[in-house]
Amino acid sequence: MRAEQVSIGGIPAILYGDSAERGYLFLHGQMGRKEEAEAFALAACPRGHQVLSIDLPGHGARQGRDEELAPWTAVPDIRTALDWAERRWESISLRATSIGAYFAMLAFANPARALLLSPVLDMEGLILTMMS
């Protein structure tokens, strides 16, 4: 399977698979990195999709940069990746985990499909539980 390292507006990313009309944006969770998409890409690419995976702020190749993982930093990056994907694919789906799923729901209006693994659906509730 083809895997190409790309930079999207300074955001480190990997594009998996051959050229296709459909794609998935893959977003990792807390402490994750873009390379986690490889196993998913091995299943999705033979079915006619490409998979684009980015490093969220402070993760993967972005560790050591003075970036925080917060909605005001992650959501604009996800929208930048979506803009990039919209220029290449007719249909964009989402595969996201945990906090990546939460940020995706803030950034992504109408994915063709959404595959969410352990999504954070109630951020306020999560924070209150962690603080008690």
Annotate each language-model stretch with its function.
Residues 95-104:
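Gly/Ala-rich beta-loop-alpha elbow adjacent to hydrolase catalytic centers
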Residues 1-18:
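N-terminal cap/lid segment of alpha/beta-hydrolase-fold proteins
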Residues 21-29:
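Short beta-strand element of the alpha/beta-hydrolase
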Residues 36, 68-87:
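Alpha/beta-hydrolase active-site loop
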Residues 109-132:
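Hydrolase active-site cap/lid region
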Residues 30-42:
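The serine-hydrolase catalytic nucleophile loop
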Residues 41-63:
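Conserved alpha/beta-hydrolase
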